[in-house]
Amino acid sequence: MGALFVAGSGAGFYAWQIEPEWVEFVRRPLVIRGLPQLLAGCSLVQISDIHIGPDVANSYLIRSFKRIAAEQPDIVVFTGDFLTLRSDGRPPIDQMKVVLRHFPQGKLATIGILGNHDYGIRWKEDRVATTVVKLAEDAGLKMIRNQSCQVNGLQIVGFDDLLGPNFGGPQVLKNIDLHEPTLVLCHNPDALDFPIWNGYNGWILSGHTHGGQCKAPFLRPPIVPVHNKRYIAGEIPLADGRRVYVNRALGQSMRVRFNVRPEVTLFQLASDLAGTPSPSVAEVSSKSILIG
């Protein structure tokens, strides 16, 4: 019994104190049809779900941001969920100001979208989202909400969150020239199953799931906050040619992780002028870093 208690205590300590800050830096290619040669070989870093608030230490996020900045990324994208509300239901504004001051900047662009938590209680508080956008923009992010922006010939489209009151739906891509090289940011991957894509068949970068945060080895996580349980983590191909990459999140909404480490994704952009297939998960390489 004593050995079982020690083993259980050790596993609990690991899941509570070690793995939530044991960041995996995943390096992989991102092949975009028609990507301008000017951007070929450039780096694009995806950060997601930092959840500034009671469950993620400021010091951990700041150290992680400094490590990302040391990579000198060309483009940084953030795919939603800046915060977790405090126990009194208010956004952690002072914490956000401290942490976002260190948010890594891309040499060409730093772009963000909102997640469901950025809309406050029950994902319905527009005033919270407005505050989050202001703080993010003050920190150097260009926030896109059912809009697109151009980065050296690459069109980056950002959806507002699926669960929030301002989800753009089919109108977003109807107003976009999909013949241009395009990358879509969409916090909740469940949006992939909605009839809103207007023939788009490129890459989507998502977050939201945290990879489930906890799972037994070789098994799926028991709890994932999406309807479509395919959308857990990593690269998922869709039948119509779209591909989504679901980031496992840098933070968490409850401080526990087991066998699902936090993630920062470092993509190297490449052009698909010849229509060659996108690379598979087998081509992914990663570097593990304990931020401590």
Question: In which residue ranges do the predicted regions lie?
Answer:
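Acidic, His/Gly-rich catalytic cores of divalent-metal-dependent hydrolytic chemistry
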Residues: 13, 17-26, 238-292
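Beta-strand-turn-beta hairpins that frame and shape the catalytic cleft
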Residues: 32-45, 141, 148-157, 177-179, ...
